[in-house]
Curated annotation (Swiss-Prot):
GO terms for biological process: apoptotic process; erythrocyte differentiation; keratinocyte differentiation; neuron differentiation; positive regulation of amyloid-beta formation; positive regulation of neuron apoptotic process; proteolysis; regulation of protein stability. The modification S-nitrosocysteine is found at residue 163. GO terms for molecular function: cysteine-type endopeptidase activity; endopeptidase activity. One of its GO terms (cellular component) is death-inducing signaling complex. Involved in the activation cascade of caspases responsible for apoptosis execution. At the onset of apoptosis, it proteolytically cleaves poly(ADP-ribose) polymerase PARP1 at a '216-Asp-|-Gly-217' bond. Cleaves and activates sterol regulatory element binding proteins (SREBPs) between the basic helix-loop-helix leucine zipper domain and the membrane attachment domain. Cleaves and activates caspase-6, -7 and -9 (CASP6, CASP7 and CASP9, respectively). Cleaves and inactivates interleukin-18 (IL18). Triggers cell adhesion in sympathetic neurons through RET cleavage. This is Caspase-3. InterPro entries: Caspase-like_dom_sf, Caspase_cys_AS, Caspase_his_AS, Pept_C14, Pept_C14_caspase, Pept_C14_p10, Pept_C14_p20, Pept_C14A. Keywords: Acetylation, Apoptosis, Cytoplasm, Hydrolase, Phosphoprotein, Protease, S-nitrosylation, Thiol protease, Ubl conjugation, Zymogen. Inhibited by BIRC6; following inhibition of BIRC6-caspase binding by DIABLO/SMAC, BIRC6 is subjected to caspase cleavage, leading to an increase in active caspases. It comes from Mesocricetus auratus.
């Protein structure tokens, strides 16, 4: 007879098996039977916008002209969605860590979700404080289920406008042409996160000094149009298409001229997310 127990796919763990456990639902933790997140708490939640424009001379990094346009548009967009928006400018690594720690220690029990937007220089896996790099995973770890209990089972959205490497995308020409009746009380600590990156791993992310970044401006535009009627992943797909098809870099340096960009969405959300209820 075939063994129906589930096993761990890891070469470092041998002969280790775990049983599939069906538990009861937890109403206190924000985990519900519905297929969409509960978004009718008394508050939508906090939206922190970290806007790093000017960097210490020691880093050798240039000012991020146009980022204030992004920060202002984000504030307007998320305030319209009823979030408590907190704008923070030119933070060092230590200040960013403290900000994230303190935010994770707040009582989010009456809030539906959490949003953090980071506008800065970056590289793969890191973003820059004004004085140097910091691992993105370190910042997001403070909001894991085992550290931030009041956000368990609630969507935690991290929106990152930053480069993820130095590759350039030249583009390519194209041809024209039933509800579950049980919910487990125990959920993974990494569940219910979504990371919306402005670009794919390894690539540059583009920003216009006058109009702001392609990604953030497209995100705000699509949220304004569709936040009241579409699920968030569907909105992000439209953001991807807008950035991919409507933008192309212009530079007197041929190396950087006529380049493209595609945002990258990494979702560990366990339900559909609607900003309306």
């Amino acid at each position: 007879m075939e063994n129906n127990e589930t096993s761990v796919d890891s070469k470092s763990i041998k002969n280790f098996e775990v049983k599939t456990i069906h538990g009861s639902k937890s109403m206190d933790s924000g985990i519900y039977l519905d297929s969409s997140y509960k978004m009718d708490y008394p508050e939508m939640g906090v939206c922190i916008i970290i806007n790093n424009k000017n960097f210490h001379k020691s880093t050798g990094m240039t000012p991020r002209s146009g980022t204030d346009v992004d920060a202002a548009k984000l504030r307007e967009t998320f305030m319209a969605l009823k979030y408590e928006v907190r704008n923070k400018n030119d933070l060092t690594r230590e200040e960013i860590v403290e900000l994230m720690k303190n935010a994770s220690k707040e009582d989010h029990s009456k809030r539906s979700s959490f949003v953090c937007v980071i506008l800065s220089h970056g590289d793969e896996g890191v973003i820059f404080g004004t004085d140097g790099p910091i691992d993105l995973k370190k910042l997001t770890s403070y909001f894991r289920g085992d550290y931030c209990r009041s956000l368990i089972g609630k969507p935690k959205l991290f929106i990152i406008q930053a480069c993820r490497g130095t590759e350039l995308d030249c583009g390519i020409e194209t041809d024209s042409g039933t509800e579950d009746d049980m919910t487990c009380q125990k959920i993974p600590v990494e569940a219910d996160f979504l990371y919306a990156y402005s670009t794919a791993p390894g690539y540059y992310s583009w920003r216009n000094p006058k109009d702001g970044s392609w990604f953030i401006q497209s995100l705000c535009s699509m949220l304004k149009l569709y936040a009241h009627k579409l699920e968030f992943m569907h909105i992000l797909t439209r953001v991807n298409r807008k950035v991919a098809t409507e933008f192309e870099s212009f530079s007197l340096d041929s190396t950087f001229h006529a380049k493209k960009q595609i945002p990258c969405i990494v979702s560990m959300l366990t339900k559909e997310l609607y900003f309306y209820h």
